[in-house]
C-alpha cells in the first residue's frame, strides 16, 4: 500500500494552465472530495484518461475554479499506481487552495521526484529512463530533446539488457560447472566464452565512444576564446550572448578571469569561455588570469583564436595561437574586418578561418557554418548518445571487469576466478539501469527532480 501524494506540477507562477498531480492507493476516491464532475457522477466512474469538466473546491467547500480532470488506474499510469490530474487555470491562489483541500482529504505533499521514484520502484521505468526525464526537462536544443526522448523510451536499456542477460547465462553455466562437476553439463569451452565476453566488451566500448558527442549535445560544446589583449575576445562573447556579459574597454588586461556564457549558435548549444588576454605581465592578478587561460585551452572541445586582423601578428598572438592549435578543434577568427586588413588567411595554420567584425556583426553566419562543419550532425540523436556521467562511469567499470575476465580466460584460470570478474561486471552494469540498486545512488538521482515530477 502507498500513501496518497499531491503536488502542483506546474509551479506556483501565473500560467495559462496549472496542474495538480495526485498518486497513491485510494487517490481517485479521495480526489472526488475536492473535484466534482458537472455530471454529478463520482470521479471514480470515469474511464481512464478521459478529460471531464468539473469544479474544484477548497477545504471549506467553496468553489475556486471550473476546470478539468482525468484519472488513470494502476498499473496503467505514470507511477504504476492510481493517479489523477486536475487541470485548472494557472492561478497560484486557486492551485494553493486546491492543494490545501487535498491535504485535508488525506493527501500529503509529494517530495521532489517522488512521482518518478514511484514509477521506478513500481517497474514503470528504469534508472536511465528516470534520468532522461530530467534531461528532457533541461534540454536546450532540438538534438538534446530528441536524444532525451529516445532515452525516456528506453534506448539505453535496450542496449544494456542483452549484454547483462548474456552475462547472467554465462554465470549460470559457470556455477553449474562448479557446483555439479559430476553432472552431464556442457563442458567449459574456453574459446566460446572468450568470444562472447570480448563481444560484450566491444559493445560497451561502442556505447562509451558516444560520450563526447552526447555531452556536447546535452551540456553544450565547450569553446574557449583565446587571443592577445584587445583582440576582441570579450566583444565576441558579448555579440554571441546578445547582451554585455563582460566589460569591454581599450585598456589591455580588462578581463582577468575566465567568464562563461551558454549561447545557441544555429543548432549548437555552446558554452563560451572568455579568457584573459595572453601576454607577459608583471601584474600578479592578471598573470593568474593568463595561466587560467592556458589551462582552459587544455580542457575544451574547441578553441576560438581571436586576432585583430587590422594589425600584424605579434608574439602574444602567436603564443595564443599555439595554445589554440593544441585544442581538439580550432577556429581562427579574424576580427575587426571593418578596418583595413594586415593579416592574410594564408598566414594562419588553421583549417577553419572566419573573418568577422564584432563592431558591425558581419561574418557571424560564417562562424555558425564553421561549427556545423566541425561538429556535423552525422549521428542520430535517437537516445543512443550517452550523456550521463553516472551511467558512463558504471559502464566503464563494467568494461574493465569484463576485460579482466577475458584476460583470466586467456591465462587459463579456473571458472571460479573468472566468475569474480564477471559478477563484478554485472554489479556495475546493473547500476546503470537499477537492476543492482544502491539507495544512495537512487536518492541522489531523484533529489535532482522538482516537486510534482
Residue ranges and their predicted role:
Residues 286-310:
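Inter-motif core of Ras-like GTPase G domains
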Residues 1-146, 150, 154, 331:
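A glycine-rich (often HGG/GG-containing) alpha/beta subdomain
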Residues 272, 306, 333:
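Generic enzyme active-site microenvironment
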Residues 278, 286-290, 318:
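Short alpha-helix of the ABC ATPase nucleotide-binding domain corresponding to the H-loop/switch region
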Residues 12, 62, 76, 126, ...:
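Conserved catalytic network of the ASCE P-loop NTPase/AAA+ motor domain
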Residues 3-8, 12, 142-264, 281-283, ...:
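C-terminal-of-GTPase-core extension/linker across diverse P-loop GTPases
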Residues 52-64, 69-73, 253-281, 299:
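Switch I (G2) and immediately adjacent beta-strands of P-loop GTPase domains
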Amino acid at each position: 500500500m502507498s500513501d496518497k501524494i499531491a503536488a502542483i506540477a506546474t509551479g506556483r507562477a501565473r500560467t495559462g494552465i496549472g496542474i495538480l498531480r495526485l498518486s497513491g492507493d485510494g487517490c481517485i476516491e479521495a480526489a472526488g472530495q475536492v473535484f466534482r464532475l458537472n455530471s454529478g457522477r463520482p470521479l471514480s466512474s470515469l474511464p481512464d484518461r478521459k478529460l471531464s469538466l468539473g469544479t474544484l473546491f477548497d477545504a471549506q467547500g467553496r468553489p475556486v475554479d471550473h476546470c478539468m480532470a482525468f484519472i488513470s488506474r494502476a498499473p496503467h499510469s505514470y507511477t504504476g499506481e492510481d493517479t489523477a490530474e486536475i487541470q485548472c487555470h494557472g492561478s497560484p491562489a486557486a492551485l494553493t487552495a486546491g492543494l490545501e483541500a487535498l491535504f485535508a482529504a488525506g493527501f500529503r505533499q509529494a517530495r521532489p521526484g517522488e512521482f518518478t521514484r514511484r514509477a521506478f520502484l513500481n517497474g514503470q521505468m528504469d534508472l536511465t529512463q528516470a534520468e532522461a526525464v530530467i534531461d528532457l526537462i533541461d534540454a536546450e536544443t532540438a538534438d538534446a530533446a530528441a536524444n532525451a526522448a529516445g532515452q525516456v523510451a528506453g534506448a539505453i536499456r535496450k542496449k544494456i539488457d542483452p549484454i547483462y542477460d548474456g552475462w547472467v547465462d554465462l554465470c549460470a553455466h559457470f556455477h553449474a560447472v562448479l557446483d555439479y562437476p559430476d553432472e552431464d553439463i556442457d563442458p567449459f569451452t574456453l574459446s566460446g566464452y572468450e568470444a562472447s565476453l570480448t563481444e560484450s566488451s566491444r559493445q560497451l566500448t561502442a556505447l562509451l565512444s558516444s560520450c563526447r558527442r552526447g555531452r556536447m549535445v546535452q551540456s553544450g560544446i565547450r569553446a574557449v576564446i583565446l587571443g592577445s589583449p584587445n583582440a576582441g575576445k570579450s566583444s565576441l562573447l558579448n555579440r554571441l550572448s546578445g547582451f554585455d556579459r563582460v566589460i569591454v574597454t581599450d585598456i589591455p588586461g580588462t578581463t582577468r578571469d575566465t567568464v562563461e556564457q551558454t549561447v545557441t549558435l544555429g543548432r549548437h548549444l555552446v558554452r563560451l569561455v572568455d579568457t584573459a588576454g595572453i601576454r607577459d605581465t608583471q601584474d600578479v592578478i592578471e598573470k593568474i588570469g593568463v595561466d587560467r587561460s592556458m589551462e582552459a585551452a587544455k580542457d575544451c572541445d574547441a578553441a576560438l583564436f581571436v586576432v585583430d586582423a587590422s594589425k600584424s601578428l605579434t608574439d602574444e598572438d602567436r603564443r595564443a595561437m599555439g595554445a589554440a592549435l593544441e585544442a581538439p578543434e580550432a577556429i581562427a577568427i579574424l576580427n575587426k574586418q571593418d578596418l583595413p586588413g594586415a593579416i592574410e588567411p594564408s598566414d594562419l595554420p588553421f583549417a577553419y578561418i572566419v573573418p568577422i567584425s564584432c563592431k558591425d556583426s558581419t561574418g557571424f553566419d560564417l562562424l555558425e557554418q564553421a561549427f556545423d562543419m566541425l561538429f556535423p550532425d552525422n549521428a542520430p540523436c535517437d537516445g543512443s548518445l550517452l550523456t550521463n556521467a553516472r551511467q558512463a562511469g558504471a559502464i566503464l567499470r563494467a568494461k574493465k571487469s569484463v576485460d579482466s575476465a577475458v584476460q583470466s580466460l586467456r591465462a587459463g584460470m579456473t571458472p571460479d576466478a573468472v566468475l569474480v570478474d564477471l559478477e563484478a561486471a554485472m554489479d556495475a552494469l546493473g547500476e546503470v539501469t537499477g537492476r543492482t540498486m544502491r539507495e544512495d545512488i537512487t536518492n541522489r538521482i531523484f533529489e535532482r527532480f522538482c516537486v510534482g515530477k
